[in-house]
Curated annotation (Swiss-Prot):
Gene3D superfamilies: Dihydrodipicolinate Reductase, domain 2, NAD(P)-binding Rossmann-like Domain
Gene Ontology terms for molecular function: 4-hydroxy-tetrahydrodipicolinate reductase; NAD binding; NADP binding; oxidoreductase activity, acting on CH or CH2 groups, NAD or NADP as acceptor
Entry's family note: Belongs to the DapB family.
InterPro entries in the record: DapB_C (IPR022663), DapB_N (IPR000846), DapB_N_CS (IPR022664), DHDPR_bac (IPR023940), NAD(P)-bd_dom_sf (IPR036291)
GO terms (BP aspect): diaminopimelate biosynthetic process; lysine biosynthetic process via diaminopimelate
Name the record gives this protein: 4-hydroxy-tetrahydrodipicolinate reductase
Binding site for (S)-2,3,4,5-tetrahydrodipicolinate: H159, G168, T169
Role this protein plays: Catalyzes the conversion of 4-hydroxy-tetrahydrodipicolinate (HTPA) to tetrahydrodipicolinate.
Record gene name: dapB
Cytoplasm found in the keyword field: yes
Domain of life: Bacteria
Pfam families cross-referenced by the UniProt entry: DapB_C (PF05173), DapB_N (PF01113)
Example of a GO cellular component annotation carried by this entry: cytosol
Length: 270
């Protein structure tokens, strides 16, 4: 491919939106084609690059995907579950590929994403970081070797503004561990503990959540036995790691057929 893939960023003025715009500015194979904000925003008409602090990129923020449908190839969405579903429906109508980094979807929404992906290409991942996706592969190995004989705990920490808990990344960690052990996460997960809980059931997977300050994202899976424990940890110090992963996903997705993909496939890990 000789031409750059044009991406649209929805939620352009948000924390992640601005980082996505910055990431697009510094990509060799990606260019920013459109930036979208909610109707009524005072930022409509502003230059997206100026908003993100990377200088003028000659892309004005608009309030409707309809107005820029011919200006981009792939939509990138890190907004909210309800907003993402509306954007997905728009992409379905206009046959646009979509990268979804939003977390907090319910079961019905996930089913709808899968259904839409039968007609358009979709990358859907709770975490676009290359490091996190490598961690997920390491979890499979650790679980296969020692998961049956250890107490497994997942600890995650994020900034005080994050709305969903546990994080989508933590839940994905739990799903990988449970699937490797042949268990159902819905049946074996324990979310927090309080009071007199009794002895720990080794067949459970515990989750602990921290919300504090400006923590970008930290995730640890602990495999604890008598006398030793293994901890697999990923710490993000900047949202740029997620944004760069999303750009990589958008470039990869542009040439794909309709289907539901994840970052493991984008990175060639599965």
């Amino acid at each position: 491919m000789t031409t750059k893939v044009r991406v649209a960023v929805v939620g352009a003025s948000g924390r992640m939106g601005r980082v996505l715009i910055e990431a697009a500015k510094h990509q060799d194979v990606i260019t920013l084609g459109a930036a979208i904000e909610r109707q009524g925003s005072t930022l409509i008409g502003a230059d997206a690059g100026e908003l993100a602090g990377v200088g003028c990129v000659n892309v004005a923020i608009c309030d409707s995907l309809d107005n820029v449908k011919d200006d981009f190839d792939v939509l990138i969405d890190f907004t909210s579950p309800d907003a993402s579903m509306l954007h997905l429906e728009w992409c379905l109508r206009h046959k646009k590929p979509m990268v979804i980094g939003t977390t907090g979807f319910n079961h019905a929404q996930k089913e709808q994403i899968s259904a839409c992906a039968e007609q358009i290409p979709v990358v859907f991942s709770p975490n676009m970081s290359v490091g996190v996706n490598l961690m997920w592969k390491l979890l499979e190995v650790a679980t296969a070797v020692m998961g049956q004989d250890t107490d497994i705990e997942i600890i995650e920490a994020h900034h005080r503004h994050k709305k969903d808990a546990p994080s989508g990344t933590a839940l994905k960690m739990g799903e990988i561990i449970a699937n490797t052990l042949g268990r159902d996460l819905e049946e074996c997960a324990v979310y927090g503990r309080e009071g007199i809980t009794g002895a720990r059931d080794r067949n459970t997977i515990g989750f602990s959540t921290i919300r504090a300050g400006d923590i970008v994202g930290e995730h640890t899976a602990m495999f604890a036995d008598i006398g030793e424990r293994i901890e697999i940890t990923h710490k993000a110090s900047s949202r740029m790691t997620y944004a760069n992963g999303a750009m990589r996903a958008a470039f990869w997705l542009y040439d794909q057929n309709a289907g539901l993909y994840d970052m493991q496939q984008v990175l060639g890990l599965s």
